Amino acid sequence: MRFSVFLPAIAALSSAVAAQRSCGSIPHKAFSNELKEAMENSRTSSFSNVTSNVTINTYFHVITDGNTGKISDETLQKQIAVLNSDYKASGFSFKLVASDSVDNPTWAAGEDDMGMKSALRKGGYDTLNVYFVPMLREGLLGFCYFPMKNPSEGQKIKDGCVINSNSVPGGSAQNYNEGKTTTHEVGHFMGLYHVFNEQEGNCQQDGDMIEDTPVQGSASSGCPTGKDSCPQQGVDSIHNYMDYSYDSCLTEFSPGQIKRMQMLWQFRAGSGSGSVTRPRPKPPVLMDYEHRL
C-alpha cells in the first residue's frame, strides 16, 4: 500500500540538490575506546603486523519507490570503479559480488533501517553491504557504522553503509555526484573519523587522532584552497576523502589514515567471514505520511 500524498514529496526530494555534504556516521563510544586500545597495542610486537592487500566482498542493494531511486547496472559499475580507484593506495580493493533492487516505499524513505538490513544483508562482518536509498532524513548524503572488536549479532546486522542514491556517479546531488559519498562513508566502515573536529571551532583536540592530518576546526565546503581553520602547523585537509569538500575536490587518504585502516581491519577479519545470523524480518511498518508533510 502506498500513500499518494507522499509520492510527489519524495519525488521532489529525490531531485533536490545537496547544498553541503552531511554525514550521519557517529562512532559508538565502545569503538572510541577500542581504537585507543588498538593504538596503544600497536606499539607491541603482538600488534606490529598490519593488514594490507585485502579484497573486500561487496554487495549493493538499490532501494526504490516505483521509479524513484532506480540505479542502472552501468552506474553501479561506475560506483565500484570509483571506490576501487580511491582506495587503490590503501591496499584494499572491493569486489562487487552481486547487486539487487528492492521496491519498498518505507525503506526508500529512510525508515526501518533494521528491517531493511535484516532482510537484505549478505556475508559476514568482513563483507561490505551498501544500501542506496533515495531519501534520507535531515538531508543526509549517507551514514555508515564503525568496526567493533566484538560486535553483537545486532551490530553485525546493522553494519554497512546507507548512501543517498542521488550521490552516485551522474546523480542529481549537485557537487556531490561523482561517487565520493560512498568513498567517504566506507572510510567510516574502515575505522576513520572525519579529519575535522565535530565541535565547530575546536582547535584544542586532534579529532581523528592521526598525526599527518593537521588539526582542523571546521568541515570544508566547496574546494577552499589554503583554508586553515586552526593555528597549529598545516593547512586543512580539504582534499581528504574524510572532509566535506565537493566530490571534485576529494583526491586522497593520508599515509596515517591508510595505516589506521590496515590496523583496524583485524576487527572485521577477526569476527569471521561466515554469514550473519539474521532474525526473521517483521513486515514493513507503513507510516501515515499525510501527517508528516
Swiss-Prot record:
SS bond partners: 223-249
Annotated signal sequence range: 1-19
GO biological process terms held by the UniProt record: proteolysis
Any Gene Ontology CC annotation: extracellular region
GO terms assigned for molecular function: metal ion binding; metallopeptidase activity
Residues reported in the UniProt entry to bind Zn(2+): 184, 188
Major subcellular site: secreted
Annotated keywords: Disulfide bond, Glycoprotein, Hydrolase, Metal-binding, Metalloprotease, Protease, Secreted, Signal, Virulence, Zinc
Active-site residues, Swiss-Prot/TrEMBL: 185
Region called Disordered, residue ranges: 270-293
Record function comment: Secreted metalloproteinase that allows assimilation of proteinaceous substrates. Plays a pivotal role as a pathogenicity determinant during infections and contributes to the ability of the pathogen to persist within the mammalian host.
Protein name: Extracellular metalloprotease MGYG_00389
